[in-house]
């Protein structure tokens, strides 16, 4: 069952596009980079969410939470693209990435991205580092349930048509195409040993269904809108943001340019 959909990021995209039209040469590269990142993120999350919803929207065994942003007390937000909560109290964190021209993973575990016209791929931060951060923050949020040491599996999902150059030595099994993740999901969750499932269930109160857990995590959600606008000196409801949004660019154009 779907407990939370993706946040609507299009108002922020529209504001940034209007800002881009008004920006001077010193600000344009920053805004263009932010828009590229947002477009790619929206495209990847939307594609993965559609696939997840198609298979799990009617499930009574798995709760689905899209686009969950948790901010711990010490700061430093964790953006979880997709969280799956199985009835066995097993959790899946799915990090979606969009690479239009392909991804290379080296034998040392480094990630490199191909760009249009590039002769060599460029290095990017490891998504595994992001996932490790997300797991840590999620475990803190799960502590009130007695589930801070529950099994948490992590996967990096790419578009079904993505080109992946895999290494021979480094284990890249956690990087897969979005249309392949259900096989991993079914093998990992529904075939869990009975003693493991019972042990996880016994650590939670009977009243804490997967829906209860999902809803309590959703109550901790803090949207990223304010942070995005603040990087450009705007408040979400301030006069500058409203002025930039007066003549927003078409929404379709904001996504169609995803790279």
Regions found by a protein language model. Give the residues of each.
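Active-site beta-strand-loop-beta-strand hairpin of nuclease catalytic cores
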Residues: 85-113
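Surface-exposed interaction regions that form or flank ligand-binding interfaces
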Residues: 1-79, 86-90, 115-259
């Amino acid at each position: 069952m779907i407990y939370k959909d993706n946040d609507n990021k299009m108002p922020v995209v529209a504001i940034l596009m209007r800002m881009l039209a008004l920006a001077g040469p010193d600000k344009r590269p920053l805004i263009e980079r932010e828009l590229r990142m947002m477009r790619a993120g929206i495209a990847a999350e939307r594609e993965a969410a559609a696939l997840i919803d198609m298979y799990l929207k009617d499930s009574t065994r798995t709760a689905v939470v899209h686009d969950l942003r948790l901010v711990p007390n010490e700061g430093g937000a964790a953006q979880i693209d997709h969280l799956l909560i199985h009835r066995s109290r097993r959790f899946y964190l799915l990090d979606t990435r969009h690479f239009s021209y392909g991804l290379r993973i080296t034998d040392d575990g480094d990630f490199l991205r191909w760009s249009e016209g590039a002769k060599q791929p460029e290095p990017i931060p490891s998504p595994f580092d992001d996932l490790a951060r997300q797991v840590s923050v999620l475990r803190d949020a799960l502590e009130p349930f007695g589930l801070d040491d529950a099994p948490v599996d992590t996967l990096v999902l790419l578009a079904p048509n993505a080109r992946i150059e895999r290494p021979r030595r480094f284990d890249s099994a956690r990087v897969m195409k979005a249309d392949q993740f259900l096989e991993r999901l079914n093998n990992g969750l529904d075939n869990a040993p009975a003693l493991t499932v019972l042990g996880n269930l016994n650590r939670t109160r009977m009243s804490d269904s997967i829906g209860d857990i999902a809803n309590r995590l959703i109550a901790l959600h803090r949207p990223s809108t304010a942070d995005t606008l603040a990087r450009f000196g705007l408040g979400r409801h301030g006069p500058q943001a409203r002025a930039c949004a007066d003549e927003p660019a078409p929404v379709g154009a904001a996504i169609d340019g995803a790279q």
